[in-house]
Amino acid sequence: MPAYATRLLTGVFLSIFLFTFHADVRAQAPSESVRVLFIGAHPDDVDLKAGGTAALLAKEGHAVKFVSLTNGDAGHYNMGGGILAKRRRAEAKEAARRLKIDEYEVLHYHDGELMPTLEVRRDVIRLIREWDADVVVGHRPNDYHPDHRYAGRVVQDAAYMVQVPNVLPKAEPTEGNPVFLYFQDRFEKPYPFEHDIVVVIDDVIGRKVSALDAHESQFYEWLPWVSNALDEVPEDDSARQEWLRERWTSLMSDAERDGLEKWYNDRQVKEARYTESFQIAEYGRQPTDEEIQKLFPMLADQ
């Protein structure tokens, strides 16, 4: 075969290969990327409340960012201040790597001193705008910890303002309003949590536990100390993660199962073990069921 013909055939085969590879990559990518911003009060709050959902979103190629409004510099019994804050930033970075999310930002506000001030509200507005969030998830404003309560309050205060051009004019306002959701909590007053969106996280429960494991200062030191269980923490790494799973990832409640039935078929509901729930806030855009399935594509796949 002449050399020019060989080169021609090689070029044809290479073009076919590249086209096939490109088409395969496009098939694996989400048809429309969803941008989700999770805002907690402390490094580790979001991991505990929504680590599984975040892992599922990231696994499907969607954009996920965690934010901690405080630096966590008070959450320990024998260390604190800048040394603890530095340690907790490193733990958050490692947790983000294990969950395979895009970013984990820890702000500078002191642990235990968060207030719903104009300064914090502006930071939250900026974060939502810069991330161009479709969904923003945060604490309910009725929680046991003052930082949780005020983190929830400041997200509420920012919910409308993110779309007002004259507020922080250097940060481009959102086009319309994102959907705002609440993390699940156990508090009943002034009103109980509503399981509007329930996500099965069985496929990524190991990844969630691994992310919690990254926060050593909290799950193996501070929180066991608070509950007088420090002597129960295993020394062995694998035993630690199993202990962590048993202690911090409870099986779903009847209320969660009832919420699950809206989004999953009977077999899936019966087989599900671990879930995460979210309540739709009255602030922000009010999504239809179809919109929720677009924002949480794992629900549309059922």
Regions found by a protein language model. Name each.
Residues 76-79, 191-195:
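Short acidic, glycine/proline-rich loop/turn micro-motifs
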Residues 1-6:
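N-terminal secretory signal peptides that target proteins for export/translocation
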Residues 127-171:
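Active-site adenylate/phosphate-handling loop in enzymes that bind or generate adenylated species
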